[in-house]
Amino acid sequence: MITSPTTWPSPAKLNLFLYINGRTDNGYHELQTLFQFLDHGDQLTITANDSGHITLTPDIVDLPVEQNLIWKAANALQKKTGCTLGANIHLNKILPMGGGIGGGSSNAATALVALNFLWQLGLSDDELADIGLKLGADVPVFVRGHAAFAEGVGEKLTPAQPEEKWYLVVRPDVHIATVDIFTHPQLTRNTPKRSLETLLDSEYGNDCEKIVRMIHPKVDKQLSWLLQYAPSRLTGTGSCVFAEFNSRSEAESILAQLSDNVSAFVAQGRNISPLKETLADYLSAQNRPI
């Protein structure tokens, strides 16, 4: 066990494209999407101990700790391995909840990766991803730490190398429940499947965007504004929208034109997750294999 406090990034992600191809027999949606990480996100500071208990600070209003994905991830790791160690976990929350940029899933993945290291459990990425999949469909991509093309119901991941562009990410002041979008009767569910090579060479889109813009005027307004300046899309099921640029200065020049009451940030796309890079640094410092 490593008992000194360590700090770990919990990065945001974007769905650079998202297409819905159909439904499985049990009602889940089949999709094709491209995940890329951002160099922007939450932070978890974790101190391992021998108490056997997981404590999480600060408290989140209206969310019992046992329902928090960080706590669930730590508890699942204990049960999977029989580990009797504990940890104090402090979350520095930057990413919005319900924004479509992976906040909760990223938090869960960071907890799994960090505690596997601190408790010296030796689980592989595959084993951690299996635990993570039970917590949320997006958790495995954060665990594996590489930009990825996802297919099926999101469980089939192929590493990808999209261009690492700069993004202006804007969060309209609305909370969007994924279930509301995926159950909408007008949602496109029959986009033909295409190869990754074909998709990377095509104009990117998001099959959820039309529905979200229709039922959430604030999203429609913000996306219409961004489209004046650059290619722009919804990420996931929203509410965040993003515009892509070739340089940081271009993105920041448009950010400067936003109203002060609009929540937004500029970040660069990363094909290797900041979490994976941090783990490599800690392993190197411990002289352990990467």
UniProtKB/Swiss-Prot annotation:
Q: Where does ATP bind?
A: P96, M97, G98, G99, G100, I101, G102, G103, G104, S105, S106
Q: Name one Pfam family in it.
A: GHMP_kinases_C
EC class of the enzyme, as a word: transferase
Reactions mediated catalytically: 4-CDP-2-C-methyl-D-erythritol + ATP = 4-CDP-2-C-methyl-D-erythritol 2-phosphate + ADP + H(+)
Provide this UniProt record's keywords sorted from A to Z: ATP-binding, Isoprene biosynthesis, Kinase, Nucleotide-binding, Transferase
Q: Kindly list the GO molecular function terms attached to this UniProt entry.
A: 4-(cytidine 5'-diphospho)-2-C-methyl-D-erythritol kinase activity; ATP binding
What metabolic or biological pathway is this protein involved in? Isoprenoid biosynthesis; isopentenyl diphosphate biosynthesis via DXP pathway; isopentenyl diphosphate from 1-deoxy-D-xylulose 5-phosphate: step 3/6
Its EC number(s): 2.7.1.148
What GO biological process terms does the UniProt entry carry, in alphabetical order?
isopentenyl diphosphate biosynthetic process, methylerythritol 4-phosphate pathway; terpenoid biosynthetic process
Q: Where is the active site?
A: K13, D138
Describe the task this protein carries out: Catalyzes the phosphorylation of the position 2 hydroxy group of 4-diphosphocytidyl-2C-methyl-D-erythritol.
Family per record: Belongs to the GHMP kinase family. IspE subfamily.
Q: How is this protein named in the record?
A: 4-diphosphocytidyl-2-C-methyl-D-erythritol kinase
Q: Which species is this UniProt entry from? A: Vibrio vulnificus (strain CMCP6)
